[in-house]
Regions:
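Helix-to-loop junction immediately C-terminal to a conserved catalytic motif
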Residues: 48
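Short beta-strand immediately N-terminal to the Walker A/P-loop
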Residues: 30-31, 85
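The feature captures the beta-strand-to-loop junction immediately N-terminal to the Walker
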Residues: 33-35
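ABC ATPase C-loop
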Residues: 151-152
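Conserved ABC nucleotide-binding domain
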Residues: 70-72, 120-139
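Conserved structural motif at the start of ABC-family nucleotide-binding domains
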Residues: 2, 17-19
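ABC ATPase NBD Q-loop/coupling interface
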Residues: 57-80
Length: 153
């Protein structure tokens, strides 16, 4: 479970997130809506660890484990415990194959995982057929699947 309590963020002197409270339970899916410049991307970047919070509390509570304070954790550490997102621009390596993109994500993620072993392909079987194709040659939908698979590794 992800829990945010009174989270604040500033860009310089500009207050970009004001006392944000959010609870996301296992299996839930939420949408964050708002006009341009309202803090949606800032919120996601704070949760993922790409931006620091100025104040407030962010905790991650995995099933069967005590709540963990996310504040001191790096983006890589947060990714290792299962926190990630797919940005709008997808950020795949366009000159690398699907399989190479997944191997890079695995190297930065969970030790001992193996993309060619097929675990990720069980969740994204379409990617298996495309595993030798370069990212640039994939359709937009396939690029999003690859980006999502990378985020979930």
């Amino acid at each position: 479970m992800l829990n945010l309590q009174a989270v604040n963020h500033f860009y310089g002197n500009q207050h970009s997130l004001w006392n944000v409270d959010l609870v996301l339970r296992p299996g839930e899916c939420i949408g964050v809506l708002g006009r341009e410049g309202m803090g949606k991307t800032t919120l996601v970047n704070c949760i993922a660890g790409h931006l620091p919070v100025a104040s407030g509390r962010m905790t991650w509570h995995d099933i069967g484990a005590p709540p963990q304070d996310l504040t001191p954790l790096s983006a890589q550490s947060r990714s290792a415990i299962g926190i990630g997102y797919v940005p709008q621009d997808k950020r795949i390596f366009s000159q690398l194959s699907v399989e190479e993109n997944l191997h890079i994500a695995l190297a930065a993620g969970k030790p001992g995982a193996n993309a060619s072993g097929g675990e990720i392909y069980e969740h994204f079987p379409e990617l298996y057929a495309l595993r030798q194709r370069k990212g640039a040659s994939l359709s937009d939908d396939d690029q999003y699947q690859l980006a999502l698979a990378r985020a979930l590794i």
